[in-house]
Curated annotation (Swiss-Prot):
Signal sequence residues: 1-27
Keywords: ATP synthesis, Cell membrane, CF(0), Hydrogen ion transport, Ion transport, Lipoprotein, Membrane, Palmitate, Signal, Transmembrane, Transmembrane helix, Transport
Presence of the UniProt keyword Lipoprotein in the record: yes
Protein name, entry field: ATP synthase subunit b
């Protein structure tokens, strides 16, 4: 862009120079209707002061164009170039920051997925451990209850047997007392004993 502006400016200066030079030639030969090659020099030298005046005006015009147009234009172009470079640098910096933020976001997302997976795995492991502990505890409690129930059954069974034996002994002693008291004959004693045994068996069956 800078090279293009410089080329346009130089082209403009050259065109202005040719235009001024043409005006200068016209002013030097304004009284001559036809210019011949052999009379050009003769026509220029009589107008030497006019030529010098035009040359001085041309130089002044060039300096004016240089200071009033070229330098401000060059300064503006430099400022514009600096502004564009600054904007490009800012855009590059913003792009780099955006890329860095994107990478950070992706890294955080990946870390979040890893942490979430670890949490789920830990929760599943703890759930399995808790389930296993509950099952073991339930089995222990069930086995303990079964053992206690069996102990109670055995205890009740022993009590019943002891009670039955005690009652049998008491009945036997009572029967013996009755035999002694009655003093019946052998047949009667035999019949009484058989009846007593049947009663004991009936009581055992009932229990």
């Amino acid at each position: 862009m800078k090279l293009r502006a410089t080329f346009v400016f130089k082209t403009t200066l050259v065109a202005l120079s040719f235009a001024l030079f043409a005006l200068f030639l016209v002013s030097c030969t304004e009284n001559v209707k036809e210019i011949k090659s052999e009379s050009v020099i003769n026509e220029l030298f009589p107008n030497l002061w006019v030529f010098l005046a035009h040359l001085l005006a041309f130089v002044i015009l060039l300096f004016l164009l240089l200071f009033l147009f070229w330098k401000p234009t060059q300064k503006f172009l430099n400022q514009r170039k600096a502004l564009l470079e600054e904007q490009v640098n800012q855009a590059n910096s913003l792009e780099q920051q955006a890329q860095a933020l994107l990478q950070q976001a992706n890294q955080r997302h990946e870390n979040s997925l890893v942490v979430a997976k670890e949490i789920v795995d830990q929760a599943n492991y703890e759930a399995l451990q808790l389930k296993s502990e509950i099952e073991k505890k339930a089995n222990r409690q069930a086995n303990l209850m079964i053992f206690q129930a069996r102990q109670e059954i055995e205890k009740e069974k022993r009590l019943i047997q002891e009670q039955s034996l005690k009652e049998s002994v008491e009945l036997a002693m009572l029967a013996a007392k009755e035999l002694i008291i009655k003093k019946v004959d052998v047949k009667a004693d035999k019949a009484f004993i058989e009846e007593f045994i049947r009663e004991l068996e009936a009581e055992d069956d009932h229990d």
